[in-house]
C-alpha cells in the first residue's frame, strides 16, 4: 500500500460498527498479536480539554527524557497529526507498511460481516505503529466516551485522566452528567 491508499482505505471504513462495545476491537487486536500489551499508557478522556491535555502531557514526558507516542483525534490538516512519535508525525511509509501488515486481520473481520469501523482501524494502526517503535509511554486520547471506546482495549494504564465533562453524545453516552461521567470514567 501507498500512503494515499492508506487514507483511501481508512476513508472507506464504516463510520461506526454494527454493534457498540469492545468485542470487535478485542478480536482485531488478538488477530494482530495484541501489540498494545507491550506498551505503557497515559489514557485521557473527557468532553473538553482532552486533546490539549494529551498534547501537553506528551510534551512534558518528552521534556523529561521519555520517548513518546501520541494518539489524538481528530486531525486538523494532516492525518498523521493523529499518530506521533517523539513529537513528530508518523512517517508516511511507516503507516503504509503497518497497515499493509494489518490487512489480513482487517480482511478477516470484513469476511465475518463485522468490519472494523474507521476509528477502530485508526486506533489499531496507531497501536501497531507504537508497538513497532517502542516508545517509553504512549499518550492515548479517547475518541468518544471511554468505557466502550476502542482506545479502552489497553490494559490498565500507568495514569488515567478525565478532563471536564459535560452533556454530549447523548445517543451513545447517556442523557445525564452522571451517566456520561460513568462512561468517561470507564478508562480508570
What does each model-found stretch correspond to?
Residues 153-164:
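Inter-motif core of Ras-like GTPase G domains
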Residues 49, 75, 166:
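Short, glycine/serine-rich, charged loops/turns that create anion-binding
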Residues 16, 144, 166:
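Flexible, active-site-proximal loop/turn residues at the rims of small-molecule/cofactor binding pockets
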Residues 164-171:
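Conserved Switch II/interswitch segment of TRAFAC-class P-loop GTPases
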Amino acid at each position: 500500500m501507498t500512503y494515499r491508499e492508506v487514507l483511501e482505505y481508512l476513508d472507506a471504513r464504516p463510520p461506526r460498527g454494527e454493534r457498540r462495545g469492545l468485542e470487535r476491537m478485542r478480536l482485531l487486536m488478538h488477530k494482530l498479536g495484541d501489540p498494545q500489551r507491550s506498551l505503557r499508557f497515559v489514557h485521557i478522556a473527557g468532553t473538553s480539554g482532552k486533546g490539549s491535555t494529551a498534547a501537553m502531557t506528551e510534551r512534558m514526558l518528552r521534556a523529561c527524557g521519555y520517548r513518546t507516542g501520541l494518539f489524538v483525534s481528530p486531525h486538523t490538516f494532516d492525518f498523521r497529526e493523529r499518530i506521533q512519535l517523539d513529537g513528530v508525525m508518523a512517517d508516511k511509509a511507516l503507516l503504509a507498511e503497518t497497515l499493509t501488515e494489518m490487512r489480513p486481520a482487517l480482511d478477516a473481520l470484513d469476511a465475518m460481516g463485522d468490519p472494523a469501523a474507521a476509528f477502530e482501524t485508526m486506533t489499531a494502526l496507531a497501536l501497531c505503529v507504537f508497538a513497532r517503535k517502542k516508545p517509553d509511554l504512549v499518550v492515548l486520547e479517547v475518541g468518544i466516551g471511554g468505557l466502550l471506546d476502542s482506545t479502552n482495549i489497553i490494559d490498565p494504564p500507568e495514569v488515567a485522566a478525565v478532563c471536564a465533562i459535560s452533556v454530549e453524545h447523548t445517543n451513545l453516552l447517556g442523557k445525564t452528567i452522571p451517566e456520561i461521567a460513568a462512561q468517561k470514567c470507564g478508562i480508570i
